[in-house]
């Protein structure tokens, strides 16, 4: 099983496009590849859908599609191995124009992706749709990274390096730090981990002190 990367995204664009995205993220009956969000952003060639990702190199497939399997294609073109089809926190907002008619909307939602955020799929979608903008955030605590992707610009940080003082680091007071912490509760989780580590350290020290006094110690 992969590590799961947490994502939140805001997509702004014409109502026709936002209508399609809203239909995808609210669809609870994901039955075929065409139902996936990333498949809408950047469709995988149909000839790769039923291939086997066993590490072998299929020369015929590579010649035709540039890839041996769905896995190789997904990692390169989506930045993640699987499509995403479970969403939460779905919210749509109309953007009124000067004449009061809404021709644009923005939609917000969250989802999880395997190992990494699907930023290559975002890139492809905004390249193909110049009237669409995407701002997305992501956090993968197990692999120690997080970031903000804004219309092709990806600011990615190693959490332990950008915030070496943990939950009290000054990074969490920056605009990027506040945004990511508000979305993913990073400092709260850090503080809990730090408290657990401190309790364990104190417990270990107490056992050593008790033993040095000749008192019975549970081991």
Where are these regions (language model features)?
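Intrinsic low-complexity, intrinsically disordered or marginally ordered coil/linker segments
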Residues: 1-219
């Amino acid at each position: 099983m992969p590590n799961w990367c947490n994502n939140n995204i805001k997509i702004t664009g014409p109502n026709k496009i936002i209508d399609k995205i809203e239909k995808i993220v609210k669809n609870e009956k994901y039955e075929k590849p065409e139902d996936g969000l990333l498949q809408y952003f950047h469709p995988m060639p149909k000839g790769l859908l039923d291939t086997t990702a066993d590490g072998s190199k299929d020369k015929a497939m590579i010649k035709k599609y540039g890839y041996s399997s769905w896995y190789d294609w997904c990692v390169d073109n989506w930045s993640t191995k699987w499509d995403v089809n479970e969403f939460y926190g779905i919210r749509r907002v109309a953007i009124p124009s000067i004449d009061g008619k809404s021709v644009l909307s923005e939609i917000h939602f969250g989802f999880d992706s395997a190992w990494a955020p699907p930023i290559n799929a975002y890139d492809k979608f905004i390249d193909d749709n110049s009237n669409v903008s995407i701002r997305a955030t992501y956090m993968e605590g197990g692999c120690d990274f997080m970031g903000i992707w804004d219309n092709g610009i990806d600011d990615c940080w190693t959490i332990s390096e950008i915030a070496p003082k943990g939950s009290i680091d000054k990074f969490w007071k920056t605009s990027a730090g506040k945004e990511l912490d508000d979305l993913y509760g990073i400092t709260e989780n850090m503080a809990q981990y730090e408290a657990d580590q401190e309790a364990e350290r104190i417990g270990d020290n107490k056992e050593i002190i008790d033993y040095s006094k000749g008192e019975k110690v549970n081991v």
